[in-house]
Amino acid sequence: MAVAFGSVGIHVGVTVGLDPGRDKVGWAFVGEGRELLVSGIFPAGERALFWLGLRALPGDADALAPWTLEAPLPRGEASSRMAFVTAFVVGDGTCGGELASSLEAQDFGCPILRVDERGTTLEARTLYWRLHGPSWWQRLLPRTLWVPPRPLDDLAAWAIAMRGMAGPVD
């Protein structure tokens, strides 16, 4: 599989989005159709363990299990597709440069793209409700009052990956 960067972004394979932060890092494996394969959050202090987990794929399908929050696809399908990582997209916010440098040092053999992550937390809220749907009583409230019951860093990473796949905005 090949990866091409051009006027329309990243093509072919699986893209890993990373939403860096001081305390935790959201991650998401995203297919070529922008579908979420699997996502989660790991503590920033466990970055080295997360890199080891990435290297263990696809042989060890449970390598990322300790940090996994969303896995909408059947386990076998997701783990087989996760082996074909062709690019990483890192948000340029808090600690983004540090995470990108650490990722480069790992030498995964994939390009690393930095994108503007402004607004991805709000996008993550929308993605959460698309995956889970609000309860009947939440539907009675305005959408702005729908608050997801968990941190959304992994879904922000999904939004970051999709931005990288969309290509540069002129």
Label each PLM-derived region with a short phrase.
Residues 2-170:
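Phosphate- and other anionic-substrate recognition elements at nucleic-acid/protein interfaces
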